[in-house]
Amino acid sequence: MGEALNGLKRTMMCGEPREEHVGQKITLMGWVQRNRKLGGLDFIDLRDKTGIMQVVFGEEINAEAFEKAKGVRPEYCIAVTGEVVKRESVNENMPTGFVELKCQSLKILSESETPPIYIKENLDAAENIRLKYRYLDLRRPDMHRIFEIRSKTTKSIRDYLEKNDFLDVETPMLTKSTPEGARDYLVPSRNYPGMFYALPQSPQIFKQLLMVSGFDKYYQIVKCFRDEDLRANRQPEFTQVDMELSFVEQDDIMALNEGLIAHVFKEVAGVDVKLPIKRMTFKDAMEKYGSDKPDLRFGMEITNITEDVKDMDFVVFKSAIEAGGSVRALCLKGGAALGRKPLDKLGEFVKTYKAKGLAWIQLKEDGVKSSIAKFLTDDVTNSIIETMGAETGDAILIVADKESVVFQSLGALRLELAKQFELIKDKNEFNFTWITEFPLFEYSEEEERYTACHHPFTAPMEEDLDFLESAPGKVRSKAYDLVLNGEELGGGSIRIHDMELQQRMFKALGFTEEQAWERFGFLLQAFKFGPPPHGGLAFGLDRMIMFLAGTENIKDVIAFPKNQNAYCYLSEAPNIADEKQLTELGIGILPKQEKQEQE
């Protein structure tokens, strides 16, 4: 049984003692990193979230403490009191390495079994073990540093927004399911058998209702939930910095959030963000980088060479152009040195993005070498080289197909080449850009209808309104995303505040009037009562912390994350519900075989 504190107070953290504290009597509390014996003395490295302090036990220092220390093992939780003295053998690798504590009193507050993971910086244990024993994983000082950054970031965000007259308002966690986009997490209602709440994917409708309520400027740091197939750096529950403003236009929201980003990155990471942040249309981003989340830390833009090759007698290029597609290319500096095998691997790589293959031209010292040499004339070759701005030693990598495939495959290839050839020179660079003028709709082949690129409440650009019914694919939106180093940091839009336009939007999405009112009637009803022009934005807080903390794994910035299958190794959630609970909720679970037969 562990000893009680009985009034004993900690007077200093383990990482704090310095030479100026020599001669002082202090009390430290923490966990044993290691216990070693040397020359008749015991040396314990005592750790807390601030660092490690060496504590010395000896017969002549205090016999009782020395005897107790012999049984102390790693991860025991202890309290020590003693005098700070200079170390005979200095450890310059530790901030406390010039001093040590001569222990005059030891309390063993609690014992520990042998831990399944070793508590140290840069732990290389298997992820499932780290997540199962997350409370041990979180003892590591580098994990504490991340959550100190997270706490500092949320405070910085709140300070900035409240200084700009934003009001923190909580919105419901139990909401109505509106099946559009990702799947909802459903919560059965005991009071209304057979009916369900949904956990919010975002506070979208409620924050718009707050604008109708006259709140003017709202914000919330809020949990959101999406039951989707998890990709890298996605979690089923995540934290969003959510905001909405009335009587504003797009430029107002972007300027305010540029100020927020500059404030937070300076205060938390000491980074000066250059303002104003550059802007790029969705169309330009796709054509130049093959992505609406371009990584601008390196060049290598996609170049359109359709005009250069349109008269070539090469069926792949010809058929792509005739079908309304294009021929585009990347210029890889130094790529002429690549052998056939790595070029073939790049060809296989683009095929995973539905490209039919990769044509290439290498500009070697002794002439041009190409996978399509027999179709190239000197004039066409020279025209391509000039358009690409290529030089001797370079390689030109070409894809021909419908534009969606060309952009996707070359965009992915661009990022792959950046990894392989280390094209990002400054890994600590923060390169921001706004992406604007997104399409309002995208066509779903699976559902055979148009779906909203962002959500159904995004306002279309006025100049494109005439296309809303006749050519939805041509309509651009008043939506904007903030991209950092190839990752979407946040996104938002100006909202529709006109009931007639909102109904036109629902109709374009394939909703009948009855379906629109059934799903979103409470918003449409509110729009009868003078809604103001409004818009907003939401940042992914978890992703922002990843950048500020310098980690590439989203699980590092969430205290108790799920794995890629939305499973919690620590609590073993989800679990089987008690039969009594299911009965109260009016729920029956189909046997697996019966479920499969019904499907």
From Swiss-Prot:
Residues holding ATP: 226-228, 235, 488, 540-543
Subcellular location: Cytoplasm
Catalytic activity: tRNA(Asp) + L-aspartate + ATP = L-aspartyl-tRNA(Asp) + AMP + diphosphate
Region annotation Aspartate: where it falls in the sequence: 204-207
Cellular component, GO, one term: cytoplasm
Record bears the keyword Aminoacyl-tRNA synthetase: yes
GO terms, molecular function: aspartate-tRNA ligase activity; ATP binding; catalytic activity, acting on a protein; nucleic acid binding; transferase activity
InterPro entries on file: Aa-tRNA-synt_II (IPR004364), aa-tRNA-synth_II (IPR006195), aa-tRNA-synth_II/BPL/LPL (IPR045864), Asp-tRNA-ligase_1 (IPR004524), Asp-tRNA-ligase_1_N (IPR047089), Asp/Asn-tRNA-synth_IIb (IPR002312), AspRS_core (IPR047090), GAD-like_sf (IPR004115)
Keywords attached to this entry: Aminoacyl-tRNA synthetase, ATP-binding, Cytoplasm, Ligase, Nucleotide-binding, Protein biosynthesis
GO BP of this protein: aspartyl-tRNA aminoacylation
Cysteines engaged in disulfide bonds, as pairs: none
Keyword Chaperone in annotation: no
Domain of life: Bacteria
E.C. no: 6.1.1.12
Oligomeric and partner information: Homodimer.
Entry's family note: Belongs to the class-II aminoacyl-tRNA synthetase family. Type 1 subfamily.
Annotated protein name in UniProt: Aspartate--tRNA ligase
Source organism (scientific name): Clostridium botulinum (strain Alaska E43 / Type E3)
Taxonomic path: Bacteria, Bacillati, Bacillota, Clostridia, Eubacteriales
Gene that encodes the chain: aspS
